[in-house]
């Protein structure tokens, strides 16, 4: 993207009806590591790929606990995600204190949409550079919601965001009809297979780079990290590797040089 006179501030429209600062914030989501969310009739699952800033650093958390019935996975700026997560936790606490009941998932997502819309319309503010996948369970059943820096939010059956997430979405679209009838173990495996599609061929999922969040009927939101992920990875079939091209024998004569073209 190249700078122009219409991307100096979020309140400036381009002649094409676009707000470039919001589009730039959407690009920040694509820079984050991939995360996948999907649901069945009884459960909602988040699967995220963790990154380490260097070999000396620990892997960053990608799935955050919000309330007993809600959790989120993030792609984009971690600092922005932390602020939004604290806001969501406060709203859930307020609902339990004032109304003595858990906050419905759709209501919480609506509040997030309203909060993230404010910096897209006020001078001197910047949009939140993070996308969220929100998994929850309430009286209406399991939910997977996606939120964007543009303040849009979507109710999804399955979704993936982050770097190389198109490969994961292709897998989800191909197997979407199977998700609703899956048990919990099968649903997690589908999420892991989709997440694995975002990795280069020479890499694979391990207990160090995968985090899993699960919520469902009679099951509070639980995050599985490190050794807790092992039972799910053990049942996952080995990733098919790309076929190696056979090496050309050393004693094989070189190809003849192209003859000059006739004029």
UniProtKB/Swiss-Prot annotation:
It comes from the Eukaryota. Residues 230-263 are annotated as: Disordered. One of its GO terms (biological process) is ubiquitin-dependent protein catabolic process. One of its GO terms (cellular component) is proteasome core complex. The keyword Plastid does not apply. Keywords: Acetylation, Cytoplasm, Glycoprotein, Immunity, Isopeptide bond, Nucleus, Phosphoprotein, Proteasome, Ubl conjugation. SMART domains: Proteasome_A_N. The keyword Cytoplasm applies. It is found in: Cytoplasm; Nucleus. Glycans are attached at residue 110. Residues 253-263 have a biased composition (Basic and acidic residues). Component of the 20S core proteasome complex involved in the proteolytic degradation of most intracellular proteins. This complex plays numerous essential roles within the cell by associating with different regulatory particles. Associated with two 19S regulatory particles, forms the 26S proteasome and thus participates in the ATP-dependent degradation of ubiquitinated proteins. The 26S proteasome consists of a 20S proteasome core and two 19S regulatory subunits. The 20S proteasome core is a barrel-shaped complex made of 28 subunits that are arranged in four stacked rings. The two outer rings are each formed by seven alpha subunits, and the two inner rings are formed by seven beta subunits. The proteolytic activity is exerted by three beta-subunits PSMB5, PSMB6 and PSMB7. Interacts with NOTCH3. Interacts with ZFAND1. This is Proteasome subunit alpha type-1. It comes from Pongo abelii (Sumatran orangutan).
